[in-house]
Amino acid sequence: VPKVVGLVIGTRPDCISEEIIDYLSVLSKKYFISLEFGVESTLNSTLKKVNRCHTYEETKATYELCKNKGFHLGAHLIIGLPGETKEDLLNHAIEISKLPIDTLKLHHLQIVKQSIMAFQYKNNPENFNLFTSENYIDFITDFVGLLRPDIIIERFVSEAPQDLLIAPKWNGLKNFEIVAKIDQKLAEQNTWQGKFYREDSQLVK
């Protein structure tokens, strides 16, 4: 196609076949090909709870099929899914770092109108540990310290339309304002991405 220089494809890790991977690998010799997969969590218990209908083992297998094929590989991760503790969330950084990814997009959990989670949140809000903006900034400071240093973080937060967002509100803070506060917190803590990363890192207990 004239003027097309590449493709960025975002999908689920269980929605791509070896046949498609091989085809895209051929295209990658001439075009830029980026594949981004919705990992969302590295815990099978969470993936089952939120009805993802795939396992983390399937996610890892998909990345294995895609590595060394000429692709730019990315991952999406949701921070704060129901039932996950701070230790679970920090362990995501350790597990994600083992994947052959180039980029990572982080999304803090948001409850939006007319979703299944909106119904669950209304009926059982105690099952949700939604971050305040201050707590999220503090958490991300710890998270990036455990993350492999060569992974490019392309996004720190999501931003649902205000007319659809139920929680958390964060007083209308914009993405760029949160990123600026994260930068400031990293400087204050004298920490940086990968400061505590080790190839043989064990899960946080």
Kindly label every feature range from the protein language model.
Residues 9, 13, 107-109, 132:
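Glycine- and other small-residue-rich loops at beta-strand/loop junctions that grip anionic moieties
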Residues 47, 51, 82, 122-128:
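Short helix/strand-bridging catalytic loops that position acidic/His residues to coordinate divalent metals
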Residues 1-56, 61-62, 68:
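Conserved SAM/AdoMet-binding glycine-rich loop
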Residues 26, 54, 92-93, 122-124, ...:
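Short, hinge-like loop/turn segments at secondary-structure boundaries
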Residues 5-16, 31, 66-71, 163-187:
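Conserved N-terminal glycine/acidic-rich loop preference
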Residues 103, 111-205:
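Auxiliary Fe-S-binding modules of radical SAM enzymes
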Residues 19-20, 48, 86, 116-118, ...:
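Short, well-ordered secondary-structure micro-motifs
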Residues 57-117, 134-159:
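Conserved C-terminal portion of the radical SAM core fold
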